[in-house]
Amino acid sequence: MQSEQVRNIILVGFMASGKSSVARAISRRCHWPRIDGDEEIVARARKPIADIFRDSGEDVFRALERTVVSDICGEAGRIIAAGGGSFMDDENRQTMLDGGTVFYLSARPETIHYRVTRGNPNAPVRPLLGAGNPLQRIEELLQERMPVYSQAHHTVETDGLSPDQVAMAILKICGPGIPQYI
């Protein structure tokens, strides 16, 4: 029987912090459905996020993101991998904090840079990181976002850990609040 202690498990963090991979690992263990915020936005808009920004602008994207966050946090028993920037929005953040147990997946800038480039210094740079030094931009963005990320209910370090190890750490924090089929 599902405990009322944990309504949803919501994973937030910077790009490449492991949200989607960890959500899959948790879902396998507790048999709760995994919902990826970015995937849900793409499905509803029927186009990639970059195209939403290009065709309709950031305001339209953020409005759709708020609707998606509200909808996916509205039901219980879900593992939610939030979009990389969705927790930065005040309304989204409050919806997530009210809708489940929020875990900030923390990673060092060097780890994020490696994951984004897959260790290839010539890999294409994600738009958020812009031109210039991607590692420096990651450091700047993490520093800007830390006051917001610190509002999550829990912080879990992901450096040097596999998605399964991070999932187990999260499930340990949740305790008997969710079923586990390991």
Identify the residue ranges that each predicted region occupies.
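NTP-dependent small-molecule kinase module
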Residues: 2-5, 25, 29, 75, ...
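Hydrophobic anchor at the beta1->P-loop junction of P-loop NTPases
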Residues: 11
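Walker A/P-loop
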Residues: 20
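A glycine- and Lys/Arg-enriched "phosphate-lid" helix/loop adjacent to the NTP-binding pocket
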Residues: 98-146
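Short glycine-rich anion-binding loops that position phosphate/pyrophosphate groups of nucleotides
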Residues: 84-86, 108-110, 161-162
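ATP-dependent small-molecule kinase phosphotransfer cores
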Residues: 36-97, 118, 122
